[in-house]
């Protein structure tokens, strides 16, 4: 995709007409709701098998190949297996909350998809309707709030388990989502300023001919934040197997564990759909000559799904290539790098918006500033701990060892008066008073006649 300087123009405030979303018949609203629910379930089943096959290819393995054609029904087999597993509840668990927590984790993942536009207006059984369940004047804020509600299920699951490892995992998850939710919110601000609206349908319409991926810092900031938001590698610290066994879902089994698994992959699909809507034009075709006519009917739904799969592959690629960060590196990267860079980029965007007079002259400077800040973010991600800081720590440790006192200079307590007393040697098999301590041997085995 090529974005010229003249196409990236700050939009005037847009007030999209949202009155049509309440005019659909009830059966059509119900049909679209069921379709969104089925789409999320199918994408989850597909994502699980797709991830296993891609990671197997990266590791030069075969991957799942037993259930269904070439193993593509492996997710159904795993789901049936989990449903038939024994459902165990720890004795020290708070049972009502322990049972409710997986549901609280999965439901918000479905709610965020209510305002995602899948396509333009189409005809369904003679009724004209948009391929979107609902829209709001603050749809993006609604998605941000719905995505953050899932942390309550994680916290309650760790607290109600009555175990140390789940509690530590839930606390990590809460700190992680709070930290990266701020950076994710900052990545949205530039999109709001350019689109002039918080409505998802309005943002997609404003990207006709120009995608907001040109806002490089916002795009990079969101891509990093969405990985931290979903607890995926390299930010899967709440589920660190080497430290916390399984994290917040250590004590869960059977269908309750499947709910957590379902919530994780639905969250992946949700944040990928948000990225597609805000930065890749949603259901709009790529701004390439010759594709402008493929933006009506059911064809835009295909564009949306292809962009969604691109972000899902990005998640899988990170899992197969990057190691897990340390917890201190992860939190320092969020608070010391992502949030300051996000604030700096918002300041740059707001400055250009306020003092904008000649868009064609100022837009190249805006794109240049965005590229520089985006490169800073990528470099910081590749070196989260800071190589210079790490060398300083190692040098301080070497100085500390060099300055440590030797054994001769350590003041030792004086020996007891009269010198050390040594007990006389005692023959083996006897105690200090001379009695035998030999354990009698076992009797010989009976000989069968």
UniProtKB/Swiss-Prot annotation:
One of its GO terms (molecular function) is NADH dehydrogenase activity. Belongs to the complex I subunit 1 family. Keywords: Cell membrane, Membrane, NAD, Quinone, Translocase, Transmembrane, Transmembrane helix, Ubiquinone. The gene is nuoH. This is NADH-quinone oxidoreductase subunit H. NCBIfam families: PRK06076.1-2, PRK06076.1-4. Residues 396-449 are annotated as: Disordered. It is found in: Cell membrane. GO terms for cellular component: plasma membrane. Its EC number is 7.1.1.-. Pfam families: NADHdh (PF00146).
């Amino acid at each position: 995709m090529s974005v010229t300087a003249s196409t990236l123009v700050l939009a005037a405030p847009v007030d999209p007409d949202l009155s049509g979303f309440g005019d659909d018949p009830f059966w059509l609203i119900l049909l679209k709701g069921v379709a969104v629910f089925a789409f999320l379930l199918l994408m989850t089943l597909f994502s699980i098998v797709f991830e296993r096959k891609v990671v197997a290819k990266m590791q030069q393995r075969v991957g799942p190949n037993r259930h269904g054609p070439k193993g593509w029904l492996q997710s159904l087999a795993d789901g049936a297996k989990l449903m038939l597993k024994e459902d165990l509840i720890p004795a020290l668990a708070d049972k009502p909350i322990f049972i409710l927590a997986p549901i609280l984790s999965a439901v918000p993942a479905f709610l965020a998809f209510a305002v995602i536009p899948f396509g333009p207006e189409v005809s369904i059984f003679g009724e004209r309707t948009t391929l979107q369940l609902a829209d709001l004047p603050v749809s993006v804020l609604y998605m941000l709030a719905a995505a953050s509600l899932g942390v309550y299920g994680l916290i309650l699951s760790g607290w109600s388990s009555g175990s140390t490892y789940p509690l530590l995992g839930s606390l990590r998850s809460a700190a992680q989502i709070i930290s990266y939710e701020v950076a994710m919110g900052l990545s949205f601000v530039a999109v709001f300023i350019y689109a002039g609206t918080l409505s998802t349908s309005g943002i997609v319409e404003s990207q006709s001919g120009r995608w907001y991926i040109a806002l490089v810092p916002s795009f990079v900031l969101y891509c990093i934040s969405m990985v931290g938001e979903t607890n995926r590698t390299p930010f899967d610290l709440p589920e660190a197997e080497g430290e916390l066994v399984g994290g917040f879902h250590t004590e869960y089994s059977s269908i309750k564990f499947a709910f957590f698994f379902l919530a994780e992959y639905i969250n992946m699909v949700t944040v990928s759909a948000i990225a597609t809507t805000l930065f890749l034009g949603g259901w709009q075709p790529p701004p390439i000559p010759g594709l402008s006519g493929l933006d009506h009917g059911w064809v835009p739904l295909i564009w949306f799904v292809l962009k969604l799969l691109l972000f899902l592959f990005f998640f899988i690629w990170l899992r197969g290539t990057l190691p897990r960060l340390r917890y201190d590196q992860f939190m320092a990267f969020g608070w010391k790098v992502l949030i300051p860079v996000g604030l700096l980029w918002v300041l740059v965007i707001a400055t250009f918006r306020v003092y904008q007079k000649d868009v064609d002259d100022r837009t190249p400077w805006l794109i240049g500033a965005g590229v520089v800040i985006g490169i800073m973010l990528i470099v910081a991600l590749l070196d989260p701990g800071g190589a210079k800081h790490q060398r300083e720590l190692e040098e301080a440790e070497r100085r500390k060892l060099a300055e440590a006192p030797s054994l001769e200079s350590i003041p030792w307590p004086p020996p007891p008066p009269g010198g050390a007393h040594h007990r006389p040697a005692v023959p083996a098999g006897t105690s200090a008073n001379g009695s035998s301590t030999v354990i009698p041997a076992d009797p010989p085995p009976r000989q069968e006649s």
